[in-house]
From Swiss-Prot:
GO terms for molecular function: nuclease activity. The keyword Transmembrane helix does not apply. Keywords: Cytoplasm, Hydrolase, Nuclease, Ribosome biogenesis. This is Putative pre-16S rRNA nuclease. It holds the Pfam family RuvX. It is found in: Cytoplasm. Its EC number is 3.1.-.-. It comes from Polynucleobacter necessarius subsp. necessarius (strain STIR1). Could be a nuclease involved in processing of the 5'-end of pre-16S rRNA.
Length: 147
């Protein structure tokens, strides 16, 4: 069965690994299903952070934003959960782009063991978040196509 056109329209997504001191950013598209780490923003305040993000959005023109949803290993929320949700809501409010949430448990832990990743850990974490989003999107599209 062919998928309807709406289901195969390419998505350019920008993902964020939110932290109170640094925010990792990655970009990718649904055609390659791969993400590319862009940068880690070390912003002293939210004005600086959102100005940097605005520049990245202007450059890459994503039509979807993805934010990592941090929780404890058992899925329970912790102190960063509400902060990440607030950040995602601010992204949506400021830039009028849809925001998707992706479980980010273990993304940093997976990368911390890789010495090459440590220098830009947050941006690489955002890449994993983005690739997880594409994987989940693919799974959802395949499920809908089978219905």
């Amino acid at each position: 069965m062919l998928k309807p056109m709406a289901l195969i329209t390419p998505i350019t997504a920008m993902a964020f690994d939110y932290g109170t001191r640094r925010v990792g950013v990655a970009v990718g598209n649904s055609v390659t299903k791969a993400g590319e780490p862009l940068k880690t923003i070390a912003a002293p305040n939210s004005d600086t952070l959102f100005k940097d993000i605005e520049q990245l959005l202007a450059e890459w023109q994503p039509n979807q934003l993805v934010v990592g949803h941090p929780t404890h290993p058992d899925g329970a929320p912790h102190e960063m959960t509400a902060k990440a949700i607030r950040f995602g809501n601010q992204l949506h409010g400021r830039f009028q782009l849809p925001v998707a949430w992706v479980d980010e448990r273990y993304t940093s832990a997976v990368l911390e063991g890789d010495a090459q990743m440590r220098d830009n850990l947050d941006a690489h974490s955002a890449t994993l978040i983005l690739e997880q989003y594409f994987s989940e999107l693919d799974t959802n599209l395949n499920t809908k196509a089978a219905d």
